[in-house]
Structures are given as C-alpha cells and as structure tokens.
Amino acid sequence: MAETATIARPYAEALFRVASEAGAGNLGAWSELVSEMGQVAANPDMQALATDPNISGDKLEEVFLSVLKSPVNDEARRFVKLLVENSRLTALPEIAEQFHALKNAREGSSDVEITSAFPLDASQTNELVAALERKFGRKLYAKVAVDPSLIGGVSVKVGDEVLDTSVRSRLAAMQAALTA
C-alpha cells in the first residue's frame, strides 16, 4: 500500500495543479470526475484489463473512457493516456484518494466517518455533523455507516482522531478496569 501511495502522489499532485489552474469553480467538477475514475479503475474487471498484456494501450484507454459517465475533458483524456502509457492505471484509486485529500486541504475541510449502531436520519446526521464542525473548526463531509456491533452510540473518525462513544467501547473500558 505504501508503494502505491508513493507512486500515486506525483500523479495526484500534477492532476490537482491542472484542476486548480482550471479555476476554483471547476475543482468540484474535477473532484467528481477523479472520484468516478478511481471507482472505475478499482473495479476488478478493469484491474484485470489494465494488467492484461494482450490488451493494447489504445484499447484500454478507449474502454476506460467509455465506461465513465461524467463528461471527460481533454486534460483528463491526456491524464488517462499518461497513466496507461506508464502502466499506472491500477494506481488510479489511490490517486483519487490523494487528489481528494489535496482538495480538502485547499478548502480547509475534512472527511468524517460516522459509524452508528442504528441508522441515522438526515436531521440526526446534520445535527451531529454541525456539532463536529464546531468541535473541529472546519467543514466536514460525512460518510455514515451502520454497525450493530456498537450496541449503541456512535464512533466518529476525522483524520487520525477517533471519538468513540459507543456502548461497546464503554463496556470494553469497564472490562479492562475490572480485570486490571
């Protein structure tokens, strides 16, 4: 994984520079396109195509671009061509992650992973995100998951920081205190 991250970094930085030069208004569109490209490249069938020595670079590029639903501009086409020529299409999911991290850093925002024991409705999610934004002092983009093993409460991850208020973690802490 570290090797893929190292390979992906210069590609992500270069693509981010190109997207930034296109204007701040286009950064959102670029982010969506790069995210979609990363998802398509992560598909096992696409991974198999990308590593198949019998598939020509032109054919791989054509197939990859035809699968994308978002409109693809000339810069993105050239970027895909560069990845195919350098046999780096399989690194595109990591490139997309690093691109997203660069975008968040530019905007002063972060992603937040919220895991709840029970499904949260939109108002609960918005209220929780608003409280977390006040705590962390920046805009947060929520990704919500449900994990019944938490028993109750939520676990929140923002970057490297984890806030675990789940019943499961409290029970584990009580067990550790009682057995110590």
Swiss-Prot record:
One of its GO terms (molecular function) is proton-transporting ATP synthase activity, rotational mechanism. The keyword Flavoprotein does not apply. SUPFAM superfamilies: N-terminal domain of the delta subunit of the F1F0-ATP synthase. It is a peripheral membrane protein. It is found in: Cell inner membrane. One of its GO terms (cellular component) is plasma membrane. It comes from the Bacteria. It holds the Pfam family OSCP. Keywords: ATP synthesis, Cell inner membrane, Cell membrane, CF(1), Hydrogen ion transport, Ion transport, Membrane, Transport. F-type ATPases have 2 components, F(1) - the catalytic core - and F(0) - the membrane proton channel. F(1) has five subunits: alpha(3), beta(3), gamma(1), delta(1), epsilon(1). F(0) has three main subunits: a(1), b(2) and c(10-14). The alpha and beta chains form an alternating ring which encloses part of the gamma chain. F(1) is attached to F(0) by a central stalk formed by the gamma and epsilon chains, while a peripheral stalk is formed by the delta and b chains. Belongs to the ATPase delta chain family. F(1)F(0) ATP synthase produces ATP from ADP in the presence of a proton or sodium gradient. F-type ATPases consist of two structural domains, F(1) containing the extramembraneous catalytic core and F(0) containing the membrane proton channel, linked together by a central stalk and a peripheral stalk. During catalysis, ATP synthesis in the catalytic domain of F(1) is coupled via a rotary mechanism of the central stalk subunits to proton translocation. This protein is part of the stalk that links CF(0) to CF(1). It either transmits conformational changes from CF(0) to CF(1) or is implicated in proton conduction. This is ATP synthase subunit delta. It comes from Cupriavidus metallidurans (strain ATCC 43123 / DSM 2839 / NBRC 102507 / CH34). The gene is atpH.
